Amino acid sequence: SKHKADMIEAGWDVAVGHGNGPQVGFILRRSEIAAKYEGMHEVPLDVCGADSQGAIGYMLQQTLQNELVSRGIKKPVATVVTQVKVDKDDKAFQNPTKPIGSFMDEAEAKRRQAELGWNVVEDAGRGWRRVVASPLPMEVVEIESVRALIAAGTVVITVGGGGIPVIDNNKGGCLGTAAVIDKDFASSLLARLINADLFVISTAVEKVAINYGKPNEKWLDKITLAEAKAYLAEGTHFAKGSMAPKIQAVIMYLENGGKEALITNPENIGRALRGETGTRIVRE
């Protein structure tokens, strides 16, 4: 929260997205254990996502509010439980790849597949797991509320964990669906929808590198959209589960009218905003 407060103190209006990687899995696992041993109902995946937004949002808004108060800054902070619409025809639904929940034996996995329509896979010799789709985010359902809060001077925490995935219910409304949306893609969409001047991705490294971990490793200070696309296309620079989606998210943002993106680690956000470190990605 200190790093976000630094941005706010420097005059930025801030909207915050966050992941929910382990937490949503723990919520699901607790519900599966409670169902198995206590006969309680299992919590659907979309509701697990909502639970995680509430809990993580509460922690973020409280710690950020406390930090702002300690600096004498009067600025409200609020979390919006956020639904993100995906396309029910997204090809990700035909090829679910995200493992979630508990390990099962084959018999249990096959039973759930038959009774509940789950997609299940054998996971590296460790047992069977459910897999769900990771579709692309298309629309932030609560975007008007988010915009109104930002306009009123509120720091908004939104699209937590990539948002609660929902599909069109064919009546103009929404219906929750079992999926996981990439947090970087959802934050990229949010940045475009609020017309952000800067899209900051806070991660574990100070700068982005090409040839990461190799003798010819090179840390990048500033690259263009075209360079980012070329490096991504080469397929050898960015790890699939970590940096690659962040670069993809930046590309989506810049290709759809975004102005500038910045990737760095939390403790260097202040310095990176002053141009002293981090990797900036610009349109040209």
Sequence positions of predicted segments:
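C-terminal catalytic "cap/lid" subdomain
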Residues: 1-284
